[in-house]
A protein has these predicted regions:
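Conserved adenine-binding aromatic site and its adjacent loop/helix in ATP-hydrolyzing domains
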Residues: 80, 112, 139
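Conserved Walker B
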Residues: 98-102, 114, 130
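Structural recognition of the conserved hydrophobic beta-strand(s) that form the central parallel beta-sheet
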Residues: 95-97, 110, 122-127
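Charged, glycine-rich active-site and insertion segments that engage polyanionic ligands
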Residues: 1-34, 119-122, 127-291
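Conserved catalytic/switch belt of AAA+ P-loop NTPases
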Residues: 83, 108-122
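Clamp-loader machinery-focused feature within the broader ASCE/P-loop NTPase space
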Residues: 1-105
Length: 291
């Protein structure tokens, strides 16, 4: 079996759970007892503590603020582990999630391990945006793509009252669940109005900013960016020909914002204003706002 795999697809399709289950299968060996709980030969790299203060809180078992990216120190610590033998059997698995949020130095460091993987070591790179990985990393891994889910399947999981969530989930069960948990339907309705008719008076933009709230969490911002992109993607089919280029440009700008949001120190108020402006411009607004 190849040593490096990219698990690619939208957020909310079950890639993380699949990676954990696949890792269990990879490290299991006949006649070698396996631990029931956390496995010492399955290593998960994700967002670590933001700073020393957060690291102390994490060590004490307290809530802590996470970094916005996966850093080179985490990759180097993992590589130190690779210099030792696995604890239980002869194989180990490294899961990196989300791999597209590795800092550039971290990606370069990981590349060395992918080029010369230790015997019995497998890498599972979970990504919502495979294009965000270095081409050299992509070339050394095989890609397993997770397809979108159909509406009927999502509805079976979510039950009654989920139609609006399903319509804007873009085939992602996780996105539909977040839509319902975060009560995003009022936001979705304003976004659809902005994309359809613009906002020459700024009233809809003000309404959207009010619906989102003054201090949205990082997770809420990411869901709102996803929702804005889906809104534009769905609007282009019915848009007049003279508006389609504007929708495409606005969608590209939202994709760029979504890629930067986890690692850039954006002011949330300004970011929400920019999202509102991009939607309004796609709908034909004449004057953008930038906070």
């Amino acid at each position: 079996m190849h040593h490096g795999w990219i698990l690619a697809g939208k957020a909310g399709l079950g890639k993380h759970d699949f990676a954990l289950q696949a890792a269990r299968e990879l490290v299991s060996e006949e006649a070698v007892p396996q631990p029931i709980g956390e496995h010492p030969d399955i290593h998960m790299l994700t967002y670590g503590p933001k700073d020393d203060k957060a690291a102390r809180a994490a060590a004490e078992g307290k809530d802590y603020e996470r970094a916005r990216s996966i850093r080179i120190g985490q990759i180097r610590a993992m590589q130190q582990r690779l210099n030792t033998r696995p604890s239980v059997g002869s194989r180990r698995v490294i899961i990196i999630n989300p791999a597209d949020d590795m800092e550039r130095p971290a990606s370069n460091a990981l590349l060395k391990s992918l080029e010369e993987p230790p015997q019995g070591t497998f890498f599972l790179l979970v990504t919502h945006r495979a294009s965000g990985l270095l081409p050299t990393i992509r070339s050394r891994c095989r890609i397993l793509r997770f397809p979108d889910m159909d509406d009927e399947t999502i509805a079976r999981h979510l039950g009654a009252g989920s139609n609006a969530a399903i319509a804007l989930a873009g085939g992602s069960l996780g996105a539909a669940r977040k839509f319902m948990e975060m009560k995003l339907e009022p936001i979705a309705k304003v976004m659809q109005q902005l994309a359809a008719q613009g906002d020459p008076t700024l009233a809809l933009r003000a309404q959207l900013i009010s619906e989102i709230g003054a201090r949205p969490s990082r997770e809420r911002i990411q869901s709102i960016l996803d929702l804005a992109r889906t809104t534009l993607a769905q609007s282009i089919a019915d848009a007049p020909a003279d508006k389609r280029l504007g929708i495409i440009d606005a969608h590209a700008a939202l994709v760029d914002l979504a890629a930067k949001a986890p690692t850039y120190n954006f002011d949330n108020g300004l970011l929400v204003g920019e999202i509102a402006s991009l939607l309004a411009n796609a709908g034909g607004a004449s004057e953008p706002i930038h906070g």
